[in-house]
Amino acid sequence: MQTPHILIVEDELVTRNTLKSIFEAEGYDVFEATDGAEMHQILSEYDINLVIMDINLPGKNGLLLARELREQANVALMFLTGRDNEVDKILGLEIGADDYITKPFNPRELTIRARNLLSRTMNLGTVSEERRSVESYKFNGWELDINSRSLIGPDGEQYKLPRSEFRAMLHFCENPGKIQSRAELLKKMTGRELKPHDRTVDVTIRRIRKHFESTPDTPEIIATIHGEGYRFCGDLED
């Protein structure tokens, strides 16, 4: 497996240097950014596997940047921040963060959690996604293209899917008509176990629905099964 690339987005120099030293000592390739502009520049130039980001940043804060990150890149995301209230933590996870750690942090715990996250996200589905006999799934005029990890609309327009959305859609298409619990979907999407107040699945499904549901509040393709989870009701072509 390639050496993981970690991007640290932190405007405080001492903390940034500390994190860089910690992860370089573990053998990772480490990149640094102090704000959103630098983050996007690095993401456009390098294949980043994990972003470790503070919330309190100059310009756009980490929560806003996390929303952009989830729309634009397939990358694992960990918040490392001094904001330790439950509201920020829940919001961060709702946006799609894979982990949330508060300062001051234990370096050993941080590296273990980063390693576990990288192991899950870099290995999750790589074999199964690359060795499938089918290259795409077509339903209701739409196509899920596995090689490009994108949705193609009836008009031919292509929508590149973030990692979590692609994995959710792939799981739905492989299991049409079956009820999928939030715990199972989260495991497929991120490798994480479902915890109380984790809204990652619901937020992800809401984003997916915006692509192909004409009325997302009354969805027909991905149905909500109250108290159980979600079910893919699309008309898959043979």
Swiss-Prot record:
GO terms for cellular component: cytosol; protein-DNA complex. It is found in: Cytoplasm. The keyword Phosphoprotein applies. The keyword Transcription regulation applies. Phosphorylated by ArcB. Residues 134-234 bind DNA. SUPFAM superfamilies: C-terminal effector domain of the bipartite response regulators (SSF46894), CheY-like (SSF52172). Disulfide bonds: none annotated. GO terms for molecular function: DNA-binding transcription factor activity; DNA-binding transcription repressor activity; identical protein binding; phosphorelay response regulator activity; transcription cis-regulatory region binding. GO terms for biological process: negative regulation of DNA-templated transcription; phosphorelay signal transduction system; positive regulation of DNA-templated transcription; regulation of DNA-templated transcription. It comes from the Bacteria. Keywords: Activator, Cytoplasm, DNA-binding, Phosphoprotein, Repressor, Transcription, Transcription regulation, Two-component regulatory system. Its main location: cytoplasm. The modification 4-aspartylphosphate is found at residue 54. Pfam families: Response_reg, Trans_reg_C. Residues 5-118 form the Response regulatory domain. Member of the two-component regulatory system ArcB/ArcA. Represses a wide variety of aerobic enzymes under anaerobic conditions. Controls the resistance of E.coli to dyes; required for expression of the alkaline phosphatase and sex factor F genes; it may also be involved in the osmoregulation of envelope proteins. When activated by ArcB, it negatively regulates the expression of genes of aerobic function. Activates the transcription of the plfB operon by binding to its promoter. PANTHER family: AEROBIC RESPIRATION CONTROL PROTEIN ARCA (PTHR48111:SF55), REGULATOR OF RPOS (PTHR48111). NCBIfam families: PRK11173.1 (NF008378). This is Aerobic respiration control protein ArcA.
